[in-house]
Design a protein with these regions (language model features):
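Short, Lys/Arg-enriched, disordered terminal segments
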Residues: 1-3, 188
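Short linear clamp-binding motif
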Residues: 3-11
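Residue-level detector of conserved, function-critical positions
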Residues: 16-187
Length: 188
């Protein structure tokens, strides 16, 4: 916490994160179209149903009584910036997928996973499997492959390990988690 945050607290001023926490703990956010999910370590996510899918919108930190808008109503990431993406790992991907990452589009199946040692994996699908485009009669399917990139966030919704394409080498996630845990531990 910065000195300015400490002074604001002493003066009784709430931060935006503290105000959002209070709002998200009202009855409105305890029923549809919202859904509360526990992520462990005093953390939770509030999802919102959009176009028939649950989307992770808000990250809740019960330990600090703060909340963060992770994704906005337009399904764009709020706490992630272009600097939080390992662009080198995306260079051989289709241009449409790279464009979605550049636009910070969180439109497809993407999730904040459980917290462990102060960090959580985020899986961000930047290109869906071709079946995504198929209608009820089976028409419209494309030959697209599902593409997910992965990153790690801390309990303040900040990226600590950049999002990158791991080319389905899931052992890489263990390395990324260890790196994220070290970064968070070194801040304490």
């Amino acid at each position: 916490m910065s000195i300015y945050d400490k002074i604001s607290k002493m003066l009784g001023h709430e931060s935006d994160a503290e105000k959002l926490y209070k709002v998200l703990n009202t009855d409105e956010y305890k029923e549809r179209p919202y859904e509360y999910s526990d992520l462990g370590e005093g953390m939770a996510v509030i999802g919102e149903t959009m176009w028939g899918w649950w989307k992770h919108r808000f990250l809740i930190n019960h330990n600090t009584k703060c909340a963060y808008e992770f994704m906005d109503k337009d399904q764009r990431l709020v706490t992630v910036t272009e600097d939080d993406i390992d662009w080198e790992s995306l260079k051989n991907l289709p241009e449409d997928a790279i464009g979605r990452a550049r636009a910070l589009s969180f439109h497809f199946h993407s999730f904040i996973r459980h917290f462990e040692n102060g960090v959580a994996e985020v899986s961000w699908q930047i290109n869906p499997d071709g079946r995504y485009y198929m209608d009820d009669d089976g028409f419209g399917m494309t030959d697209d492959d599902e593409i997910e990139i992965y990153g790690f966030i801390d309990q303040n919704a900040k990226v600590v390990v950049k999002f990158k394409n791991i080319n389905e080498h899931y052992g890489e996630l263990d390395k990324m988690r260890k790196e994220a845990e070290q970064i968070v531990k070194s801040r304490q």
